[in-house]
């Protein structure tokens, strides 16, 4: 029994090899995340007599290089939640935090949890690409929100509340009507310096050129509102440049998001569970690929409770002696990205209210009972995941083995 504890960091790791009763096989030593160093580590582990198991924390993405390469070398690798390592064996008043001490602690954890360690599954390239794209998608969505708020903050000084004039959804290229309008009519004087009929004609030609629907009543409403607005910034080239730059930045990130959304759907369609996931209510070509990206291969979960714990939507427990708390908040120890996606699915269900969907029926029942928002949304996410697990696993088991 050889326990290999690896404290992973960016570009390098600290390794310690131990046996039961504190026997040191190899004191902590550092390796680089290079082919030569990893191969040397594999040779060292294989040279040690007895079964070896390797444990590391799944910290960010740093651990993936080692986990992937060591698994390919047919070694037993287990990636553990850092929280479990941190809470393990805290029986000392001294606070020691170093890479060497952490590597030894992970090795001791390996010995203590030997029978319960779960082997790391190498994520196939397609799922890995999909998950990476989804994380990039989330990154750009945050930037889009920031860019949008930035543009609204600037445009409110030249054309107040112009962002509320249109509620058209974003196009497939990411463009939005109010953003295009603000780019052309970037100052309130761009509208009210014209006569009413001249603006209506100009707006009509703009709609035709941009391929938007034209409404004369809407044009008249815009013109009448413009006469009452009070701008702060002057109508000059400097102000125009500031607004144009903000519009260009927002359009750029919007285009990137929509191209990623399309690419994610194309990639997800190559996965075997795609038709089952897409058939579920509340899931479309955007949220479906996001779900598959974050959940990954369902077969790695042993039961329904495992997948809800992975998402952090499993109900908590608080009992002590004769005390038993009836309402306990969820663990929230799982993937926050997956929880966000699940809440978006629940939001779609609430807005579309499909009466024949069991998840919506469950949410509606909880709402009727007067449950708070987060309670019924989390309960719905838990039920959705359980159904997801059952349907996908049943479908995958029915497929012929390749």
Model-derived segments and spans:
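A detector of single, family-specific signature residues
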Residues: 1-402
